[in-house]
A protein has these predicted regions:
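Mixed-charge (Asp/Glu-Lys/Arg
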Residues: 1-39, 44-152
Length: 152
């Protein structure tokens, strides 16, 4: 019996994109923790040339359709991504980069919802220090208390 190892699609898609840019031919490798309970790091990118590694943390979201059609008319995207504010779990230095990942439909008028061709990834790579600043700035409008979510 072979053990089964699973990887969330968000992490797989990000790793696939990184390896398109930083391939094995350039001396880069990706390492994923064998245990999914490993906290603070989802994968490492290692440079054999420089013998250095960078730690990545992936945060993913579903895409949501904007309720207000006027916002689309004003030039805002039709879809938005909502992320949990993980400020209470954030600790500077745990990862060098945070990846915000989401899928959105580029076939807005299509009735087919599950076809691969109708979904595109959005991948934002944010350095650790900037992620801390972003999470600190996520506040409610009235009371200026930390908000539970932020959107892209």
């Amino acid at each position: 019996m072979d053990p089964v190892f699973t990887l969330p699609y968000s992490e797989y898609a990000v790793i696939e994109q990184i390896m398109k840019s930083l391939g094995k031919r350039d001396g880069f490798s990706v390492y994923v923790p064998a245990s999914r309970q490993e906290k603070n790091v989802d994968f490492l990118v290692h440079s054999a040339t420089h013998n250095r590694s960078l730690r990545f943390q992936v945060k993913s979201s579903r895409s949501y359709v904007r309720d207000d059609p006027r916002s689309v008319e004003r030039g805002h995207p039709k879809f938005t991504l909502w992320f949990n504010n993980f400020r209470s779990k954030y600790s500077p230095g745990n990862a060098e980069f945070y990846i915000l990942f989401g899928l959105y439909s580029h076939a807005v008028n299509s009735s087919v919802r599950s076809r691969k061709e109708s979904w595109l990834p959005l991948i934002l790579c944010i350095p650790d220090i900037e992620m801390g600043v972003i999470l600190d700035s996520v506040k409610t409008k009235r009371k200026q208390t930390p908000d539970r979510f932020f959107y892209v």
